[in-house]
Design a protein with these regions (language model features):
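Short alpha-helical segments and helix-capping/turn motifs at coil-helix boundaries
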Residues: 39, 66-70, 159-168, 254
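Short amphipathic alpha-helical segments and helix-helix/interface helices
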Residues: 43, 164-171, 224, 228
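Surface-exposed loop and adjacent secondary-structure segments within mature catalytic domains
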Residues: 78, 82-83, 182-218, 249
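Noncatalytic luminal/extracellular "stalk/propeptide" segments of secretory-pathway proteins
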Residues: 7, 12-15, 19-145, 153-154
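Short amphipathic alpha-helices and their capping/turn segments at secondary-structure boundaries
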Residues: 3, 167-172, 256-260
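Soluble metallo-hydrolase cores and metallopeptidase-like ectodomains found primarily
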Residues: 108-138, 204-282, 294-297, 301-308
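A conserved hydrophobic secondary-structure block that centers on an alpha-helix together
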Residues: 128-185, 189
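Catalytic-core environment of secreted peptidases
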Residues: 7-35, 41-53, 145-161, 182-185, ...
């Protein structure tokens, strides 16, 4: 028998958490006041649903978003190409052509990215590393930017590896930037004919030194194709500026509501309330956390009606 589920209440829970997000990009990044406020709100709702609740704190490696997130392709103008004239794609290159990409929709920061400041005029090389496996020449992208495509493997072969592995290769080969192109997931769901980017983390404990100076983002399929066609295979220059501090530890907050059962056997139901961004679907829409909150409310109502459960929830 299924429990009841109030979709309107669930949407209200989700909106309440969204309203607590960062004023710039809507996220509730771990260790920030937005994340702590969200955790406290969830604990309060658990208590209001009749569940004894706690709020735990854990000291973990964290990263903090700054204020600069820029990506742009510049096509040099005629002025910038004159011998002895201004540098191509510099401010003095008056007839240059620029294509700006939008943070949150065209590209999103990946977990534990570092900071990087690459103006287009520096003409830093961008190297297409295909799926980024160990057979690719990562050293060719040293002091440059690697472009890796998120793909499934063919004929039973392994697909693109994890963010952790990719970032370790970037660090080992002294890359300044790493761009993963989403060409595998969330395709045609939110944007017709495109695969929208999403934010994923990595296992920072795998790194002896946190990669503070490597910018790490995921871009949509269309943006990745533009970088490949206009920069890797043509004369375009990429501007890449990412500001993230990944060098500190801080506290994350875990709200927990408990329904004691007749036995010590556990049913664990959870979702993450922290998020770098907040948006539709692929970025993070807070639906998981809101669903858990509504389930907790329904379990509280059932406990009032039926008494304690057999298992501890």
């Amino acid at each position: 028998e299924l429990i009841d589920f109030d979709t309107n209440q669930t949407r209200a829970y989700a909106q309440g958490l969204v309203d607590l997000g960062d004023p710039n990009w809507g996220g509730r990044l771990s260790g920030t006041v937005e994340e702590e406020n969200a955790a406290q709100s969830i604990k309060t709702n658990f208590s209001n649903s009749g569940l004894p609740s706690t709020l735990e704190e854990f000291d973990v490696p964290l990263y903090y978003m700054g204020n600069t997130f820029e990506m742009m392709i510049c096509i040099p103008g005629n002025v910038g190409g004159i011998f002895g004239g201004p540098a191509p794609c510099s401010v003095a290159d008056l007839d240059r052509d620029e294509v700006q990409f939008e943070h949150r929709s065209d590209f999103v920061v990946q977990g534990y990215s570092g900071s990087v400041n690459i103006p287009a005029s520096s003409d830093v090389q961008v190297i297409d590393l295909d799926m980024g496996n160990e057979t690719q020449d990562w050293s060719a992208a040293s002091n440059g930017i690697g472009l890796v495509w998120l793909l499934d493997g063919e004929n039973g072969q392994q697909g693109t590896e994890s963010n952790t592995i990719l970032m370790k290769r970037a660090q080992e080969n002294s890359l300044r930037g790493l761009i993963v192109v989403n060409s595998r997931q969330n395709c045609d769901d939110l944007v017709s004919g495109d695969c929208v980017p999403y934010s994923k983390s990595l296992d920072i404990t795998e790194f002896e030194e946190r990669p503070y100076d490597i910018g790490f983002v995921m871009v949509s399929k269309s943006v990745g194709e533009s970088i490949r066609d206009q920069v890797v295979n043509s004369e375009g220059m990429l501007e890449f500026r990412i500001e993230v501090d990944n060098q500190n530890n801080g506290n994350v907050h875990v709200p927990c509501g408990i329904l004691e059962g007749e036995t010590e056997q556990l049913v664990v139901i959870g979702a993450h309330h922290d998020t770098v961004y907040n948006g539709q679907g692929a970025v993070d829409n807070t639906a998981g956390t809101a669903t858990v909150m509504e389930m907790a409310r329904q379990f509280g109502l059932l406990q009032e009606e039926l008494g304690e459960p057999v298992l501890t929830i």
